[in-house]
From Swiss-Prot:
A ubiquinone binds at residue 200. Residues 39-129 form the 2Fe-2S ferredoxin-type domain. Transmembrane segments: none annotated. This is Succinate dehydrogenase [ubiquinone] iron-sulfur subunit, mitochondrial. [2Fe-2S] cluster binds at residues 92, 97, 100, 112. Its cofactor is [2Fe-2S] cluster; [3Fe-4S] cluster; [4Fe-4S] cluster. [3Fe-4S] cluster binds at residues 195, 242, 248. One of its GO terms (cellular component) is respiratory chain complex II (succinate dehydrogenase). It comes from Danio rerio (Zebrafish). NCBIfam families: dhsB (TIGR00384), PRK05950.1 (NF004616). [4Fe-4S] cluster binds at residues 185, 188, 191, 252. CDD domains: fer2. Belongs to the succinate dehydrogenase/fumarate reductase iron-sulfur protein family.
Length: 280
């Protein structure tokens, strides 16, 4: 019993004994400064509202150590810290809105998804989307593109509108899957402005982006106006200026295939014309 009490007393005394903390002194020093990584960006500049202003390339230098990884990060840094007159479109910074579509190092893409080439010996060249009127600097005039999109009536159309807004228009899983690879288009116009046929016939040829959206509604099982949509593409230009160059598919920043969608419309058009001929 005495041994137990002695053991408990030792434990209690150990609990109340002040702790001894070893303090180690170390000399601190600032982290060594990172070597500057200066990257040159040549950016298309032009303000048509300024009398005498002519298109030119303007060079900016950025330390990549103080900039985000994407080309859009560099553009925002230039505008915020170097030249507030630089004009470009941007919004989501996540490849969702399509606002920052431009031509970077010769290819149409989204600035928010395009990584800066860290090779500082190479200059990054940035232009607006090709073969479109320029509003200012990197901002193209999208008016014609949006007018063409509006012309295909990109929305669900029903012949019987008596139940409109009263019930859901259901479709099978299989029918819904047919829309995959079509509805994801963000209308950035990268594909259309990479298409030589669209360059020369933009006033008549609808272009890859708009035609892919037309196809999206043609094959929607809930839509009742497929034949009407096909009938509007019978002229020699709206659809048939596509020569399967496939620049559209190669350049799409969302990985979609407008070229395939156009080919499917052409196949549907054959059946439609045959049916139309029989009816006549």
């Amino acid at each position: 019993m005495a041994a137990v009490c002695f053991s408990l007393s030792r434990c209690c005394s150990a609990v109340h004994r002040p702790a001894v903390t070893a303090v180690r002194f170390a000399q601190t020093a600032a982290a060594p400064a990172a070597q500057p990584r200066i990257k040159k960006f040549q950016i298309y500049r032009w303000d048509p509202d300024t009398v005498g202003d002519k298109p030119r390339m303007q060079t900016y230098e950025i330390d990549l150590n103080t900039c985000g990884p994407m080309v859009l990060d560099a553009l925002i840094k230039i505008k915020n810290e170097m030249d507030s007159t630089l004009t470009f479109r941007r919004s989501c910074r996540e490849g969702i809105c399509g606002s920052c579509a431009m031509n970077i190092n010769g290819g149409n893409t989204l600035a928010c998804l395009n990584k800066i080439d860290t090779n500082t010996s190479k200059v990054t060249k940035i232009y607006p989307l090709p073969h479109m009127y320029v509003v200012k600097d990197l901002v193209p005039d999208m008016s014609n593109f949006y007018a063409q999109y509006k012309s295909i009536e990109p929305y669900l159309k029903k012949k019987d509108e008596s139940q409109q807004g009263k019930q859901q228009y259901l479709q099978s899983v299989e029918d819904r899957q047919k829309l995959d690879g079509l509805y994801e288009c963000i209308l950035c116009a990268c594909c259309s402005t990479s298409c030589p046929s669209y360059w020369w016939n933009a006033d008549k040829y609808l272009g890859p982006a708009v035609l892919m959206q037309a196809y999206r509604w043609m094959i929607d099982s809930r839509d009742d106006f497929t034949e009407d949509r096909l009938s509007k593409l019978q002229d020699p230009f709206s659809l048939y200026r596509c020569h399967t160059i496939m620049n559209c598919t190669r350049t799409c920043p969302k990985g979609l295939n407008p070229g395939k969608a156009i080919a499917e419309i052409k196949k549907m058009m054959v059946t439609y014309k045959q049916k139309d001929a029989v009816a006549a």
